[in-house]
Curated annotation (Swiss-Prot):
The gene is rps19. PROSITE patterns: RIBOSOMAL_S19 (PS00323). It comes from the Eukaryota. The keyword Heme does not apply. It holds the Pfam family Ribosomal_S19. This is Small ribosomal subunit protein uS19c.
Length: 92
């Protein structure tokens, strides 16, 4: 179910403060966050945000096409390595 349009998109307060502080300065720093549920808003465009995937932080550069999506969509948590090639040894 999608979020009601009466409500604003969810962005963690600490993440919003960090982005506003970096927008006031001319410097670009990597913002480290664990908030995968935060929605990407237009003020985040041009920043690099390191999103936690459960093991490490993956740096993701935010573009205009990502606006409206969640941060967690761009940091996959599972790493599928494929099925076993030869399963005959375990069947014996």
């Amino acid at each position: 179910m999608t979020r009601s349009l009466k409500k604003n998109p969810f962005v963690a307060n600490h993440l919003l403060k960090k982005i506003n502080k970096l927008n006031n300065k001319a410097e670009k720093e990597i913002i480290v966050t664990w908030s995968r549920a935060s929605t990407i808003i237009p003020t985040m465009i041009g920043h690099t945000i390191a999103i936690h995937n459960g093991k490490e932080h993956l740096p993701i550069y935010i573009t205009d096409r990502m606006v409206g999506h969640k941060l967690g969509e761009f940091a996959p948590t599972l790493n599928f390595r494929g099925h076993a090639k030869n399963d005959n040894k375990s069947r014996r």
